[in-house]
Amino acid sequence: MHLSEITHPNQLHGLSIRQLEDIARQIREKHLQTVATSGGHLGPGLGVVELTIALYQTLDLDRDKVIWDVGHQAYPHKMLTGRYNNFNTLRQKNGIAGYLKRCESKFDHFGAGHASTSISAALGMALARDAQGEDYKVAAIIGDGALTGGMALEAINHAGHLPNTNLMVILNDNEMSISPNVGAISRYLNKVRLSEPVQFLSDNLEEQFKHLPFFGDVTPEMDRLKEGMKRLAVPKVGAVIEELGFKYFGPIDGHNLRELINTFKQAHKVHGPVFVHVATVKGKGYELAEQDQVGYHAQSPFNLVTGKPIPSSKPKPPGYSKVFAHTLTKLAENNPKIIGITAAMATGTGLDKLQQKLPKQYIDVGIAEQHAVTLAAGLACEGMRPVVAIYSTFLQRAYDQVIHDVCIQNLPVFFCMDRAGIVGADGPTHQGMYDIAYLRCIPNLVIMAPKDEAELQRMIVTGVNYTDGPIAMRYPRGNGLGVPLMEEGWEALPIGKGEILRNGDDLLLLGYGTMVNTAMQVAEILGEHGIEATVVNARFVKPLDTDLIVPLAKQTGKVVTLEEGCLMGGFGSAVAEALLDHNVLVPVKRFGVPDQLVDHAKPDESFADLGLTSSQIADEVLKSFFKTQEPSVIS
């Protein structure tokens, strides 16, 4: 059977092991071809091919529900649920999402982009099933990286207290999240995987039994026998899980279809919560990805033979994350109090560079954003300079800790929010739209954003040097503007002070962060129409430079704000509030992300869809404030 013929996962029922192995081969081929062409997550999905096939072969997915954690490990799931034939649109505008979306398929039972949510959602569905007197299976598939998240442990704690609620938790244990896992839980799982009795029984039991005359060929009961002997040989296998109220199976070879199918069939018969521990290899089937599991977690388009990224047509400036990591590491070399903290995102944030150079000044807490923030608060209490490098979208997970543990106590923690603004192909779960709004309302917190990578360097110095309380900096995904950078000697910025980049009497353009460059482009377009605009780089949304902005607003009589974030509660709102507070009643036009979700697409496509290109903004300004002028041509 060809994979393109499978439009429903129940078509796996009745297929032989050989046929299922062929399906697995086709999934890996399609997975590799697609990601090599258009980019996406590579290692996670390759590691769960057999797990997915085996589980779906034992379920009725017209009724039963499977909840995937994170979602980027669910590419095989997408191919088996009717999306093979348009899988080449993965992560492209109007194409298949890189994560799970309930609106995309009836088989995507719960949306996922952030880690550690699956067990909670699955338990909720299981309880709803029981409350409504229905009868179907619910399974959650979670990686060992996501299992370091407190939310997953909270859900396990709850589920283990419900002995009459049927729920299957499947641990996809590949010893990795994006980077190698950290912490006691990971260490415990590795002991289980790598214990000598488990390894011997997994590798040699069938071969040994073949030599016994009364056994002959390996019987269908071998997997059950193997499981029982593992328990006798290693009493501690799964002991912690079973003490928490789960029936434990494992560890199971995650690439042995026969063993997986037999184990899942046994587990389905268990009454109450059951935990199936599956040992997999991240990147399975692509040797380069197996050897470099961090580097091949996610890829831009690459050459399948060499594994090397396809070079761009022209050189690109260094990315913001790279500049951040380089600058912070240089500062940390001369300041042993600087401690970089990441929540399992060392590579993404660039803190792996700090780890390599100054390992004693680096902490990876695992997927534990709440802990990361309060840990930083504790470090700050004792005079250290904690720098929490975190994606904007993930800081949302620690909002209470930001308020309660940092800002109320006015502790000097430096939050560096990567991927702020429009992130592109990762879509709504990863867009960094909300940080300006959700942080601006918190007392004691200073918030800033650089206009380019050179100003990023100065803001890093500003944040490290600021000891009067907490401070946050947002910066985007992707490459800088190509401005000259300094290797040292960066000067801190005065807190709460912006700068004038261009003078004009007709209009005030206030840009924040990445939109400062756009504001300059808008001013150029307006200048072609005889309209001269003052352009201000705000630098700080809190405290806002009202000493600069208010007089300029009075002088020009027209104000336009530009930001790469949500309009509600954002930078434009801060400006409008300040003008009202100073009784300056001038028209204000705000440009940013409206009250909507921004789907996956290339960033420039999203900017155009949102009306945030320089030509679109200039046209709108002309129509709103200068109705006699002809609009420019939108490129």
UniProtKB/Swiss-Prot annotation:
GO BP annotation list: 1-deoxy-D-xylulose 5-phosphate biosynthetic process; isopentenyl diphosphate biosynthetic process, methylerythritol 4-phosphate pathway; terpenoid biosynthetic process; thiamine biosynthetic process
Name of the coding gene: dxs
Positions contributing to thiamine diphosphate binding: 72, 113-115, 145-146, 174, 286, 369
Organism: Gloeothece citriformis (strain PCC 7424)
Transmembrane intervals: none
Catalytic activity of the protein: D-glyceraldehyde 3-phosphate + pyruvate + H(+) = 1-deoxy-D-xylulose 5-phosphate + CO2
The protein's Enzyme Commission number: 2.2.1.7
Name of the protein in question: 1-deoxy-D-xylulose-5-phosphate synthase
Domain of life: Bacteria
Cofactor: Mg(2+); thiamine diphosphate
UniProt signal peptide: none
PANTHER family, per the entry: 1-D-DEOXYXYLULOSE 5-PHOSPHATE SYNTHASE-RELATED, 1-DEOXY-D-XYLULOSE-5-PHOSPHATE SYNTHASE, CHLOROPLASTIC
